[in-house]
Regions:
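Histidine-dependent nucleotide/RNA phosphoesterase domain, centered on the 2H-phosphoesterase fold
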Residues: 1-176
Length: 176
């Protein structure tokens, strides 16, 4: 199974993301991401076995990070990946801490996990469209806020015509 750790939005946040995505002007054959697939990736894990899944769930349970509010305030286009994204120009300290702890624990458990993929830096974004071959007009975005109260382990099924994401497990973030 193909897995990743992510922030997974609640219904209100999903609606805000959908509004931002609808306002983005795309050209050509760009494909908008279905609203049920919106997320912020914390760590892409790739193909994982059942025994590795147990270790990943242990890592998820072990995180002690605070919840936070993320302000998404700009559109961006990444030509190398051919995606249009909503970005947060500044990541909250609590999100950076969660990302750092999660990646530290993935490295600490590397012997049990044997993950092949390198860890990429934190780039707080939500993919809004894929196969964007032509740079969209990046107008100003109406900012929206995501109150991150939990993070999840997500399964990605790419066997059909489009990716289907399923929540495998969720852990609450701490609030004081």
């Amino acid at each position: 199974m193909r897995l990743f750790f992510a922030l997974w939005p609640d219904a209100d946040t999903r609606a805000q993301i959908a509004n931002a995505a609808a306002a983005l002007r795309l050209a050509g054959d760009a494909q908008r991401v279905p609203r049920e697939n919106y997320h912020v990736t914390l760590a892409f894990l790739g193909e994982v076995t059942t025994s590795q899944l147990a270790v990943l769930q242990q890592i998820g349970r072990g995180q002690r990070a605070a919840g936070c509010t993320i302000t998404f305030n700009a559109y961006d286009y990444w030509p190398r990946h051919q995606v249009a994204v909503a970005i947060a120009r500044e990541a909250p300290a609590a999100l950076t801490l969660l990302w750092t702890q999660l990646h530290r624990d993935l490295v600490l458990h590397q012997a049990a996990l044997n993950l092949k993929r390198p860890h990429s830096p934190l780039r707080t974004h939500i993919t809004l469209a894929r196969k964007v071959a032509q740079a969209p007009v990046l107008q100003a975005m109406s900012p929206f806020h995501w109150n991150a109260r939990s993070f999840s382990l997500i399964r990605s099924d790419t066997s059909g015509p489009r990716s289907v994401y399923t929540v495998v497990d969720t852990w609450q973030l701490l609030y004081e």
